[in-house]
Amino acid sequence: MTLCLVSALVFGAFSSVSFGVAASGLPRHKYSSGKQQEQSVALPRTSYDIALALDFDKRTFTGSEQLHWFNKDDQATSVLYFHLYANVRGDDNSNNNNPREVSSNSGSSGGSEIQATPVPDEPRTDVTEVRDAATNAPLAFFLDDRATTLRVNLREPVAAGTGIDVLINFTGSVPEIGPDETGLLAHVLGQVDAALRRTRELRRARDINFRSRGVMLLGSAYPVLAARTGGDWRRKVEPSIGDMLYTDVADYHVRIEAPNDMAIFTSAAERRSENSGHSEQAASSKALDTKAVNSSASTSSIAHEFTGEDLRNFAFVAGRNLRSMERAVGKVQVRAVYMAEHETVARRALAAAADAVRVFTARFGEMPYKTISVVDAPLVAGLGCAEFAGFGVIASAFYVDFDAPAMRNLPELIREQRASVEDSLEWTVAHTVAHQWWGEVVGNDPERAPVLDEALANWSALAYYQEAHGETRAAAALDDQLRGVYRIYRTFGGEDLTAVRAAREYRNFFQYAAIVTSKGALMFAALRRQMGDEKFFAALRDYYAENRFEIAELNDLRDAFFAKTAPAEKRQLARTFSRWLAEKHGDEDIAPPDPRLAESLGVNTNTAKSGDQQQQRNKFARLGKFFWQQMTRIR
């Protein structure tokens, strides 16, 4: 999965801002299913065959998956590692390195059972059984890092050039998130608070695994095989302010049983749906433990089958009030999924998504996914969008219809923010669609090199504005969405930092957005000015083609640009990369703190003592609460 982790509405009184979701020298990882294999011999592919029975009303599911994994390395391995991302908790002490061997499950012939400790208002995934698919023999499995890493001990090592099939049965649940956490006011005040706070923030599993306002999002509900780097597994999940999901591509066949009044939209294409009240029908998925899964499915359920190739993850939304509309753009079907009451805004989102696919296809290269969906869902405050393969989720807080009757009774002060709100939605749609190129098709390690997807996706949104709306609108978007984020961050006392830090080194959403997604994006604008359009876009197209379905590194990006640069200009190109990523020239290159804005808000731009900081927060909170409490009437 790739996430656009943070997107915010901080506009009107001071700016229009949309925040998106590193180090060089990472080991090369070039063995998945991309260009390199096309030049030699295509190797067997990793594949998931998953079956889920969804109990929407109870917020639970029962599942089974059969994973086929082929060992492409030159060494045998006797252990498989999976990540249970739903069990990640958003605090520094919640995931440690102490492994725990769990007791034998007497009901599964010596297998082991792992259960995550139940936590109120958090999702969870519990593994109940692991078996060798070829022999049906139980496999010992263990829990590391507080239920976030599943370690499976194989009975025999998997030799280089051979594969194995493993069966995993699991159950899970998701929390109910209240509307007070997902509305426009929550998003705005959350970003105001982040701008002023000094405490550390981390992403939580509930951000992408929840039910709210009649919509359920399952972004990481199943055990995900850990990525391999340098011949070893990436074993530990590192909670941070950035994207926690780091995966290789795989093929997916997924069967979801759900109530027959439930609409389901996923990362993959739907093959068929059928009534499913009998175990014989459920058995069409070879991964399915029919007894386990059908126990959660009602006789009035429908089984939906989905298939997809070269997906980095599989996510889906479900709900009784979900609708969809589509538009063809070349070979890609662009789809908007939305809550029925948001149809008017969803049409605008679909138009922007279709234009973005058109622009990015022409500039970067063909999109291999047949469908790209833009999904309206009530994401929690601080998370404006979340991306998965072929599937981008945008916070419902952006779906504000200013022509609705309810808007007529609002003060002019509120209605005059229309352009800012609508621009924020369009920018977020373009950013979300861009992640299909940068983060999904071309993968990267979001913990070590977040600039490769977040910064590039944010710059791509600017490129979309230039081609869809012209230079005047693009210049305004650059100032509001890129320079403006950094300027406000510095005005509120934030420190200029290098953009090649690991995601966990950024303190909160606001800092991450200012340094990675905004400052990093402006580097690409500088490179384009320096190289010219022809060489710049040729470099991006080569980078995309060379790293398709693989895990790219910062050196891969640099190499693509150096390859299009004359020898006499390479030193200057190196300086540009270094200046924007490894050095701190933000005030000079972007914008310094704005003293007039600070004075008008009663904010001291200097790093404040704790007492002064609290006073500053109170001053701004009074303004923010008054202004944005009016905005809640829109919802």
Where do the PLM segments sit?
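Bacterial N-terminal signal peptides
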Residues: T2-S16
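N-terminal, polar/Ser/Thr-rich
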Residues: S16-T62
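Beta/coil-rich, acidic/histidine-enriched accessory regions frequently appended to metallopeptidases
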Residues: A53, D57, F306, E546-R635
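Extended, low-hydrophobicity, Ser/Thr/Pro/Gly-biased non-transmembrane segments
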Residues: G107-E129, F142, V166-V317
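Juxtacatalytic substrate-recognition/specificity segment
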Residues: V254, E305, L322-Q436, E440-A449, ...
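Amphipathic alpha-helical substructures
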Residues: H342, E366-P368, E447, T472-R473, ...
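Acidic/His/Gly-enriched intrinsically disordered linker/tail segments
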Residues: D423, E454-Q530, W580-E588, P593-T605
